[in-house]
Swiss-Prot record:
InterPro entries found in the cross-reference section: PSII_PsbN
Designated name of the protein: Protein PsbN
The keyword Isomerase is annotated on this UniProt entry: no
A single Gene Ontology CC term: chloroplast thylakoid membrane
Pfam families, per database record: PsbN (PF02468)
Record-level GO BP terms: photosynthesis
Amino acid sequence: METATIIVIFVSSLLLGITAYSIYTAFGPAAKNLRDPFEEHED
């Protein structure tokens, strides 16, 4: 394979991994422990 192809595959995999981890953090089981600043400061 060419070097450019390997770099594109690596960067795409990295971005996909970061996106998947962000979604898991936002909506996964650990999301119950996240605080909601809007609920803390209701007027």
